[in-house]
Amino acid sequence: MKSTPSLYQWVVIAPKNDNTFLQAEQMLKDKKCVGIKIHPYCHKYSIEEYGDKIFSFAQKHRAIVQIHPGKEVDSIVRFANAYPNATYIMAHLGGENYINAIKNAKYGNVYSDTSGMASMKNMIVEYAVSQIGSERILFGTDTYSAASQRGRIEFAIISQQDKENIFLHNAKKLFKL
């Protein structure tokens, strides 16, 4: 990481392996590690089953957790409200259930990002901004295709300030850059 100063990383937690938390503890001490990434589908576990273990750890470290919630979007709200000192980014702005999760988080600690195909749906970015504002939407924190995502925001029918929030200001604030 020292040879690439502009590159930041996530530490992946696979909660079925207790050693994952030891590794995460060490990696979170590095300023280049921006938070924790979980992917329940790929690691074959349920957020409901392992959420307390993961999010209590995240709260203890005041960590940002990037989540691929799949069908468990509603679970995120419960955990975000139970562990308010952690911050939650649901990858791939997905639609109404994501927007409702962000609205229903009591502490304003749930965000989404614009990565992936879901945010390419017609007018989803505009709809999300109209429902929750631009302050809890991040530009592609989990994308492999920044160019297509960038165009999606640049040409969205939202204010210049909303675009700047999504592209820059929200990440700077959240990741303390």
Language model feature labels by segment:
Residues P15, G70-K71, Y144:
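Short beta->alpha linker loops
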Residues V34, I47-L138:
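Catalytic pocket-lining loop regions of alpha/beta-barrel enzymes
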